[in-house]
Amino acid sequence: MGEENQPNYTISQENWSLHRKGYDDQQRHQEKVQEAIKNNLPDLVTEESIVMSNGKDVVKIPIRSLDEYKIRYNYDKNKHVGQGNGDSKVGDVVARDGSGGQKQKGPGKGQGAGDAAGEDYYEAEVSILELEQAFFRELELPNLKRKEIDENRIEHVEFNDIRKTGLWGNIDKKRTMISAYKRNAMRGKASFHPIHQEDLKFRTWNEVLKPDSKAVVLAMMDTSGSMGMWEKYMARSFFFWMTRFLRTKYETVDIEFIAHHTEAKVVTEEEFFSKGESGGTICSSVYKKALELIDNKYSPDRYNIYPFHFSDGDNLTSDNARCVKLVEELMKKCNMFGYGEVNQYNRHSTLMSAYKNIKDENFRYYILKQKADVFHAMKSFFREESGEKMA
């Protein structure tokens, strides 16, 4: 073969699966991030970067159970043989290097300077939507009942009827072609053409109306002087996730924000989450305000009513009996009453000691001692009722 006949190209063979390795590793890492988020939800939901965000941004949150990906050199260079349990995947850590012959020092904590290395953690970029999907999956308003309906809400449109006339945009091509084929076949010519006016089929729609039961949540928070920065942060963290949960899963839920010290007043959402106050504590004032709102604005015949009160439990002792009486009065008009107490050091609570005598099954309480308890309080108050679904 002469030089003029030599091909001007070469054929090479390559393992193209290697080109996907970077993509596969990235996908595996994202799966591990999602798994870490799910396993660390109780700690993540109270991250300040999330609670103080506008709820729409992607935020960076620390995930301490996930190492940042990087290339590691094996200084121990020995060959190891081991046996797994059968469910490991590529990239999983199956063992830790135990060399060194002595117990490893942990990272220091508390006061004073230490000589041990700190604990590294991975900062993952997570959208609020991702956290919501993992958090809200098993939550619902308890004891939700069908109430008097003011108006029906259009749920969706169904094309469930066929007619011979209609809008050209709604023509049913398949039925039109079948009709033409049958008519032509009866005349001895099995063909889709020609199509006559009598072959035309149009889809028509009906609006499916879904009656929707209304609900109102009364968010009540103690803003007195005994509620320190940590107590207010915990209460606001709970109400932050509560409002997002309600607005994500329910279309017709009103939320009223009530702040109190010795007096109670209805405030805006912005004031509720940002404004600080001081003074003494008379919790009965907030229950009176809640009853006033129900009587003037939210009839129990038309609304499912859910009051939630958060406090540190430090109430005027002489006011406790009045509080119990008002809570019992509220429960007669409400689907459920929730009381959350922020009590980090397990100190004596005048309010909780009175509420423990309430035996009504619609009264729920939760004592929050650490940040992770915001997650558990949400799970406790909004747990799914397996036997009770709204008809």
Curated annotation (Swiss-Prot):
HAMAP family attached to this UniProt entry: UPF0229 (MF_01232)
Record region (Disordered): 1-31, 80-117
Bias-annotated ranges (Gly residues): 98-115
Record PANTHER family: UPF0229 PROTEIN YEAH
Species whose genome carries this gene: Bacillus cereus (strain G9842)
Protein name listed in UniProt: UPF0229 protein BCG9842_B4751
UniProt feature coiled coil, ranges: none
Stretches with biased composition (Polar residues): 1-16
InterPro entries for this protein: Spore_YhbH (IPR014230), UPF0229 (IPR006698)
Top-level taxon of the source organism: Bacteria
Membership in a protein family: Belongs to the UPF0229 family.
Pfam family, one: DUF444
Biased composition (Basic and acidic residues): 21-31
